[in-house]
From Swiss-Prot:
Pfam families: ThiC-associated (PF13667), ThiC_Rad_SAM (PF01964). InterPro entries: ThiC (IPR037509), ThiC-associated_dom (IPR025747), ThiC/Bza_core_dom (IPR038521), ThiC/BzaA/B (IPR002817). Keywords: 4Fe-4S, Iron, Iron-sulfur, Lyase, Metal-binding, S-adenosyl-L-methionine, Thiamine biosynthesis, Zinc. The lineage of its organism: Bacteria, Bacillati, Actinomycetota, Actinomycetes, Mycobacteriales. HAMAP family: ThiC. The gene is thiC. This is Phosphomethylpyrimidine synthase. It comes from the Bacteria.
């Protein structure tokens, strides 16, 4: 693996964990010395992958692991069709920017084999992917295997996406975040979407979903997968709809199955399938304030009503499982009836679908297919935990993957914040992955800056949840920042920040000179009113006396201060302070 040169801060460097032939990426942050001595470098999780030319794609990290197991083979694959790139490509006669990098023949399981991480885990096999994840999460590989075997965690790694660096989604591991990218019929290009992918993973996206609905759907996805170090998810019904000229009623199993296989062969790692939208549940949405807000959910609801039968996704679910088991594609069982407003939260339609999704989860597990369950949406704070509890009950602890939820509907332009509040809350209660929301939610297609804002905001929510859950090592990052802050190590504060660029920019707006990077104050309070500087001065002036007096620690109820010796000592210091002019900073 080639180290990335373009780090987000000069104190950052690529510093992998190397063990048993594996090279697991981490970022090392070099810290300055404290007054009391040197600080060890701080290490953080890294998602960005190696530096590469987007026209060539990433190294095929997992290729040898996959083929060494001896249970897959290459085959010719389906014929590439122009309609795969949508109606605009049909009119032009070609895709706008064909992928010309490496594209080996696709792999799939040999007859009678299932090549999923769940199948291996249930057979007692610890794969290289599991070993990689264990090093990345700083846990035992057997623990990883057991969680995957039970369905409580997934490692989404299609055999046709060998460029991906294994990661795990489960509530006993670090909370992960997903970033959505993808073009629309109105805007964006292949180059822009690849740039968004690289930008999202640079700032910490653990997975990326390509939700393209516009031009060059197939080709855009090819560029994204070949350049992605993280798992790629899709909602295949979007592309299938494009193949039938956008008419939901004209969709059928044959078109959808062909689209699924197309995406499996390309290397999509997980797919959102709205198989829980049943005909009987649609009338339950009629009294809602915002109806059905999921694009996939509305497409399938329209199809069910047009044909007055259960969807082909539900009727052919077992065949979907068989296909996914041949490529190790994970289900992301979509919540097509999720609430789109607080008024509709936790209603009969939402929970009826969730219960069906739980049943589908068990069916997928019969085929050793990995599953995560999608969740809301828009939910008031006081109603969030019920979603965790019912998902864990009905879906047997399969990883929960939620969009927020947004906890208020009054802040267009700030929905990254309204949703991050709910995201931190629901992740604290057990949700394994959070789908980011950008400031453009409900308003427009996010650009590169919006992607960064969404990722940073959701990294905050995920980390806050990990701290609250007591995840091993989570608070160490906060403690390192707090120590740097108290010691006025400004450059270390910037380096330890989720977004060093913004931290530096805000600091330098008022104190741009280089000496300000070592000053014992900031522009908020100035030099005379900085609480941390005053606290440091108190330690410097009275530290020995405080230690001698046996000042109690936090929660120490023995109250050594109450002793007569302590009272006399404090009185003496009080007289000295007043006699000296009663100034904290003596001139």
């Amino acid at each position: 693996m080639t180290p990335t040169q373009n780090e987000i801060h000069p104190k950052h460097s690529y510093s992998p964990i190397r063990k048993d032939g594996l090279e697991v990426p981490e970022t090392e942050i070099r810290l300055d010395d404290s007054p009391s001595g040197p600080n060890e470098p701080f290490r953080i999780y890294r998602t960005r992958g190696p530096e590469t030319n987007p026209k060539q794609g990433l190294p095929r990290l997992r290729e040898s692991w996959i083929t060494a197991r001896g249970d897959v083979a290459t085959y010719q694959g389906r014929e590439r069709l122009l309609i795969d790139d949508g109606r605009s490509a049909m009119r032009r006669g070609q895709a706008s920017a064909e992928w010309k990098g490496q594209k080996p023949a696709p792999l799939k399981a040999l007859p009678g084999k299932r090549v999923t991480q769940m199948a291996y885990a249930r057979a007692g096999v610890i794969t290289r992917e599991m070993e990689f994840v264990a090093l990345r999460e700083h846990v035992d590989a057997e623990f990883v295997r057991s969680e995957v075997a039970r369905g409580r965690a997934i490692i989404p790694n299609n055999v046709n996406h060998p460029e991906s660096e294994p990661m795990i989604i489960g509530r006993k591991f670090l909370t992960k975040i997903n970033a959505n990218i993808g073009n629309s019929a109105v805007t964006s290009s292949i180059e822009e979407e690849v740039s968004k992918l690289q930008w999202a993973t640079r700032w910490g996206a653990d997975t990326v979903m390509d939700l393209s609905t516009g031009d060059d759907i197939h080709t855009t996805r090819e560029w994204i997968i070949r350049n992605s170090p993280v798992p790629i998810g899709t909602v295949p019904i979007y592309q299938a709809l494009e193949k039938v000229n956008g008419v939901a009623a004209d969709l059928n199993w044959e078109v959808f199955r062909d689209t699924i296989i197309e995406q499996c062969e390309q290397g999509v790692d997980y797919m959102t399938i709205h198989a829980g939208v049943l005909l009987a549940y649609i009338p339950l949405t009629t009294r809602r304030v915002t109806g059905i807000v999921s694009r996939g959910g509305s497409i399938m609801a329209g199809w069910c009503l047009a044909h007055h039968r259960e969807s082909f996704l539900y009727e052919h679910f077992d065949e979907l499982c068989e296909i996914f088991a041949q490529y190790d594609v994970a289900f992301s069982l979509g919540d097509g009836l999720r609430p789109g407003s607080l008024a509709d939260a936790n209603d009969a339609a939402q929970f009826a679908e969730l219960k069906t999704i739980g049943e589908l989860t068990q069916r997928a597990w019969e085929y050793d297919v990995q599953v995560m369950v999608e969740g809301p949406g828009h939910v008031p704070l006081n109603m969030i935990q019920e979603n965790n509890e019912l998902e864990q009950k009905w879906a047997a602890d399969a990883p929960f993957y939620t969009l927020g939820p947004l906890v208020t509907d009054i802040a267009p332009g700030y929905d990254h914040i309204t949703s991050a509040i709910g995201a931190a809350h629901i992740a604290m209660g057990g949700t394994a992955m959070l789908c980011y929301v950008t400031p453009k939610e409900h308003l427009g297609l996010p650009n590169r800056d919006d992607v960064k804002t969404g990722v940073i905001t959701y990294k905050l929510a995920a980390h806050a949840a990990d701290v609250a859950k007591g995840h091993p090592g989570a608070r160490a990052w906060d403690d390192a920042m707090s120590k740097a802050r108290f010691e006025f190590r400004w450059n270390d504060q910037f380096a330890l920040s989720l977004d060093p660029d913004t931290a530096i920019a805000y600091h330098d707006e008022t104190l741009p000179a280089e000496p300000a990077k070592t000053a014992h104050f900031c522009s908020m309070c100035g030099p005379k009113f900085c609480s941390m500087r005053i606290s440091q001065d108190i330690r410097d002036m009275f530290g020995d006396q405080i230690a001698e007096l046996g000042m109690p620690g936090v929660g120490d109820s023995s109250s050594a201060v109450a002793s007569s010796g302590a009272r006399e000592g404090m009185a003496e210091k009080s007289r000295e302070f007043i006699a000296g002019g009663a100034e904290v900073y003596r001139r």
